[in-house]
């Protein structure tokens, strides 16, 4: 379906159930979706990207900006061949604390640093959300110029297991996770 509406339009289209989109956790690029008003992920404004609420002067539209990704300063490689792409904290203070911490790869002397998102004309990619009785309208502006961060549930799992305080354990957890995935495949 051709998406000719803009999130800022005074009136957005009314769509039938068959015209609604499947939820996209990793929306990337200039795109528009309309989700079912009862979709839990859409209601929570879920995204795989690390997004934080940013100032928007329209109270009917929620604006979120991408925070980028935490990477190793020496761009090391884990034993499984993957690179460090951690989810930055949403809170400014917590994000500042993340920077400069030792790389979770035990074989690396690098430090964690933020690779900011600059995929929208040099500015962070933005996601816009608007709730109507008919659906939840989503619009993204920009293309992420960095790798995907670890999934949010991975970070929460590490925290629940008590691994969040000792980032060195991340490499071990990633290696175990990779080995488990290989066994399942």
Identify the residue ranges that each predicted region occupies.
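Histidine (H) residue identity feature
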Residues: 30, 38, 45, 57, ...
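Core nucleic-acid recognition elements
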Residues: 43, 57-58, 65-75, 86-92, ...
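Cys/His-rich Zn2+-coordinating "finger/knuckle" modules used by eukaryotic regulatory proteins
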Residues: 87-143
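Eukaryotic transcription-regulatory low-complexity IDRs
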Residues: 124-125, 129-185
